[in-house]
Amino acid sequence: NLAQTKARNSSLEAENTQLKQALKLKKTLTDYTIINGSVISRAADTWSDLLIIDQGSRAGVKKNMPVMAGKGVIGRVVEVNSTTSKVELITTTDKSTNKFAVEADAANGKKVHGVISVVGNNQIAFTQVVDGQKLKKGTRVYTSGMGGLSPKGLLIGTVKKTTRDTFGLSDVVEIQPAGNLNDPSVVSVIKRKVEE
């Protein structure tokens, strides 16, 4: 029927757009090997925490590899099976998770470092920041590579605003994610070309 055809067409157009973004992403990440995959499961009760993709160890996916959708990082592989992998999203509220170490260039030319956390209603921010006030709105935030879990230079998002934490000791820098966290259907798992 016509309604089903229109719905399917709309779904295919959205997937096509995401595939085009994945191709664009591949051109910019020349220092990495990219494993493209599709999201096959995302439960309502863990919507902001986890999703399952259709690529696993057979495709070369390993634990802790970063995952991108659209133009930015959306999470990290936390569990790998032969044909599927579980991805923990950067919006997870799990306090025990490994956080992404990030950096941004301040107006004074220095690097500002922090760790990705979730503040408020699924809003990502980088916290434990000393010089956050020197970051302008729109400044790009990238993975720093510190801690060794993620390669350096993958886009997380852009600075939305900076505030002081409740103790007045450090800054909380809210980030507008570059990645498609709402409803990704196509993802790119990022693998270093030269694996240690």
Where are these regions (language model features)?
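A secondary-structure micro-motif
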Residues: 18-196
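An alpha-helix initiation/capping motif
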Residues: 10-13, 33
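Interfacial residues of coiled-coil/leucine-zipper alpha-helices
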Residues: 2, 6-9, 16, 23
